[in-house]
Design a protein with these regions (language model features):
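Short beta-strand/turn micro-motifs composed of small residues
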Residues: 8, 89, 241
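Short beta-strand->loop
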Residues: 89-91, 120-123
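Positions that flank functional sites
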Residues: 34, 93, 201
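A short glycine/small-residue-enriched secondary-structure motif
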Residues: 45-52, 75, 80, 107
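Glycine-rich phosphate- or other oxyanion-binding loops that anchor nucleotides, phosphorylated ligands
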Residues: 56-92, 99, 103, 150
Length: 295
């Protein structure tokens, strides 16, 4: 079987140590903080705590996706050494990264006609996207071929459920996703929006929950309703959080209590600087395998 590598973007929001452990390569998005560009490199250049503190203090943020030249330079050495590549991009519902990746893929396929270079739109984000990569790495380690992985993930990527809530509406207002009036009222009333990712990889508001305790209960209820095998779910569960570890840990405890057959403890990661530039602090995201996503 031909050797191959798995790769993704840094927006899969796993730690560098996790990516190294499962041998998945990643390419970095970019973000600006008060006009200064930084790589979204999993908190290595700027610790996540510092990033979110600066956002809270009013720093302006802006993000940029990986361009086609960067993809080209990232993949070419692996093709030169004789490896095939399966790359998953951040969801096309929130980023145009897949288009840049496909431009680079077409150029490289002309240069390396004997190599396979698959580009797949993950339709996922943050550590949900990361859980997909972790699952594929496990399949690779079992001896499955690149073609088997490609076909499997195209069939099953919508089975990876993404649920999010936020307890801080500041950056939703600043980014125009919530009107200033609605945001002000929501803040006064303690409203926490509950969102999920649909079958086109877009973030869709589903409910407005009053109070942190209630929204924590509600997001776990959504897992109960949608997880593969219900309360007998035996897969992995990941959580991402943006400078609200206590809330993330509260969700994790509840998940571990309700789902005793989980594959290991719930893994909690930071929401990285690209996605975090849009959510700001106060967001918790829950990821698990389950019912196929709908619109």
């Amino acid at each position: 079987m031909a050797k191959y590598i798995l790769s993704c973007c840094s927006t899969a929001d796993l730690s560098k140590e996790h990516f190294d452990k499962i041998d998945v390569k990643y390419i970095c998005f970019h973000y600006e903080l008060d006009g200064v560009e930084h790589p979204d490199d999993l908190g290595q250049t700027m610790p996540f705590e510092e990033f979110y503190r600066k956002m809270t203090e009013g720093a302006a943020t802006k993000t940029s996706q990986v361009n086609s030249d960067e993809y080209y330079d990232f993949w070419k050495p692996y093709l030169e050494q004789g490896s095939d590549i399966l790359h998953l991009t951040l969801s096309s519902g929130i980023s145009g990264s897949v288009n840049s990746a496909n431009i680079a893929r077409e150029d490289l396929e002309e240069e390396f006609p004997d190599r396979k270079l698959y580009v797949v739109d993950s339709l996922g984000a943050s550590s949900g996207y990361g859980l997909i990569m972790d699952t594929l790495a496990g399949m690779r380690d079992e001896g499955r071929s690149i073609d088997e992985l490609h076909d499997w993930i195209e069939q099953h990527k919508l089975d990876l459920n993404h649920w999010f809530f936020s307890t801080d509406l500041t950056f939703y207002i600043r980014g125009g996703r919530i009107s200033k009036t609605a945001g002000t009222v929501g803040t006064i009333l303690g409203i926490c929006p509950l969102l999920n990712m649909d079958d086109e990889g877009r973030l869709i508001p589903r409910s407005k929950i009053r109070g942190k305790k209630k929204v924590i209960q509600e997001i776990v209820k959504r897992m109960e309703e949608n997880a593969q095998d219900g309360l007998d779910y035996s897969g992995k569960c990941y959580i991402s959080q943006s400078a609200c570890m206590e809330d993330a840990e509260a969700v994790a405890r509840l998940v571990e209590e309700r789902f005793p057959k989980l594959d290991g403890k719930v893994e909690i990661n930071y929401i990285g600087t690209t996605i975090g530039s849009h959510t700001g602090p106060g967001t918790v995201a829950l990821f698990f395998w389950g019912k196929r996503r709908q619109g």
